[in-house]
Amino acid sequence: MPTTNIRNYIDLLGMFNIGLENGLLEKQEIVKWADTIILQDEQPDYFVIELSLCGHKSVNDIVTLLNEIIGASTPQISGRVILGLLYHRYVDRQLPLKKVVDLLYWLILYGQCSEEEKSFMYELDDRYSLAIDNIYGTVEAVEKATLRFIELYKEFRIDNFDKWSEVNRTIDQKITNLKTVVEEENKALIQGSGKTILKKAWWKFWAK
């Protein structure tokens, strides 16, 4: 029987960490994963045993435990998997749009996202606030834009960990393609309205 090297699962643990911290995952999902590893291993890693027994612990205690292995920075791919999880749970009507947007903003701050990803997320957060306050745009339009963005990550699932690296290699190009589409849409909108769209300073590529 194999013996799991917990260091090979840093990306997965990072995803668990983000999901727990933001209420997207339940601690029993982590316990279930650890139990599965224990059953398949001849000599389970002590850390996996700790996770298996953490069902009675608080979320904060489990997050602290995970951080002992993950370290100071959560891997970028962990945040991208969370985006995939957001997509599936939103389309399955398990999450409200506000929860999705709130988690996007959290990922801007702590998710090790690329600058292009942050630009999309900043825009969605700002558009949502403006729509909710009845200042500009509609919630329906924000929902459509949000879904179009997080759909890029839909091939990430908790149960296809062995495919994460392969899926991750496709993400940057998908983001580039979406960026091009949005730029073309903005140009058409400007030409159609004859007006200049005000852009936030942090939306770096929108003005290019």
Report each predicted region and the residues it spans.
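Acidic, Ser/Pro/Thr-rich low-complexity regulatory regions
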Residues: 1-208
